[in-house]
C-alpha cells in the first residue's frame, strides 16, 4: 500500500492550523478535505490486515511521497517516524502549484512548464534520498494540453535525473495508469526507459496506481511484456 502524502498544498489531518477543503466535483461530497494520511490509523489497519491474511499474502506498508524541494524537511521527519517497507518518490506540484489542475502550466509556455517540472524533479532527487523508486517520472505528459514535448529537448535533464537515481541505488516505476488516461506511450515513455537502460539502470517496479479497487493490478502483465521488448529480462 502506498497512499499519498503531499506536503505543501495538503496538511496532515491533525495539523493545528486546521483542515482545508475544496469544492467537490461530480460524484464527490460537497466539500472535500485536503488532508494527508492519518498515519496511526493507516499503519494500524495494515497490521490488522497482515495478521488476517498472513497465511495468504505478504502485505507491505508504504507511502507515495509527493515531494517538492522546499518540503523535503517534512518528509525527512515523516520517514523517521514510521516503519516503511517501500516509498514511491513523486512530484505532483512545483511551487505548491498543481499539475493536474493546470495551475502550474497556466501562464507558462510548453517549454517552460516541461523544463520547470524536470528541473524540480532533478532538485528533489539530488536532495532527498529516503525512497525506493521514482514514480511516474514523466507525469507532466498526462496534463500537457499541447501534446508530448520532444524527448530530445529534455534528454539532458532526463539524463541527469536518471544518473542521480542510479548512483543513489534507487529504481524507477512503470505506471500502468497510462491506459486510464488515454496516453499512447508507456509511463514513463519508452524513450525514457531505453535511456535508463543505456545508463545502467536495472531496478524497475510496476504499479497500477490504483485509486479504485477495479484499477488494482490493471495491465501489469502488459507492462512486463513491453519491458521485455525493450530488453529488460530480469
What are these regions, as identified by a protein language model?
Residues 98-113, 139-150, 179:
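Surface-exposed cleft-lining segments at the edges of enzyme active sites
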Residues 11-15, 125-126, 141, 148-234:
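Charged catalytic cores and adjacent phosphate/nucleic-acid-binding surfaces used
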Residues 1-65, 143, 150-152, 212-213, ...:
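An N-terminally biased module of ancient metal coordination in phosphate/nucleic-acid-related enzymes
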Residues 57-110:
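Hydrophobic alpha-helical segments and helix pairs
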Amino acid at each position: 500500500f502506498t497512499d499519498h502524502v503531499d506536503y505543501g498544498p495538503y496538511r496532515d489531518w491533525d495539523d493545528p492550523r486546521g483542515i482545508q477543503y475544496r469544492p467537490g466535483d461530480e460524484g464527490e461530497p460537497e466539500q472535500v478535505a485536503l488532508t494527508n494520511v492519518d498515519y496511526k490509523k493507516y499503519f494500524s489497519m495494515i497490521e490488522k490486515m497482515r495478521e488476517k491474511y498472513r497465511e495468504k499474502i505478504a502485505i507491505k506498508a508504504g507511502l507515495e511521497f509527493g515531494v517538492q524541494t522546499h518540503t523535503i524537511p517534512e518528509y525527512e521527519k515523516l520517514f523517521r517516524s514510521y516503519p516503511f517497507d517501500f516509498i514511491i518518490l513523486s512530484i505532483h506540484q512545483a511551487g505548491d502549484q498543481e499539475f493536474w489542475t493546470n495551475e502550474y502550466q497556466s501562464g507558462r509556455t510548453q517549454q517552460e512548464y516541461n523544463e520547470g517540472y524536470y528541473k524540480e524533479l532533478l532538485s528533489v532527487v539530488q536532495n532527498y534520498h529516503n525512497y525506493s523508486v521514482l514514480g511516474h517520472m514523466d507525469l507532466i505528459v498526462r496534463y500537457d494540453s499541447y501534446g508530448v514535448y520532444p524527448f530530445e529537448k529534455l534528454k539532458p535533464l532526463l539524463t541527469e535525473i536518471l544518473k542521480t537515481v542510479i548512483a543513489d541505488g534507487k529504481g524507477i516505476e512503470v505506471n500502468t495508469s497510462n491506459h486510464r488516461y488515454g496516453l499512447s506511450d508507456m509511463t514513463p515513455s519508452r524513450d525514457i526507459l531505453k535511456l535508463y537502460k543505456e545508463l545502467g539502470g536495472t531496478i524497475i517496479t510496476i504499479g497500477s496506481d490504483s485509486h479504485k479497487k477495479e484499477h488494482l493490478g490493471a495491465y501489469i502483465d502488459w507492462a512486463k511484456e513491453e519491458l521485455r521488448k525493450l530488453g529488460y529480462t530480469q
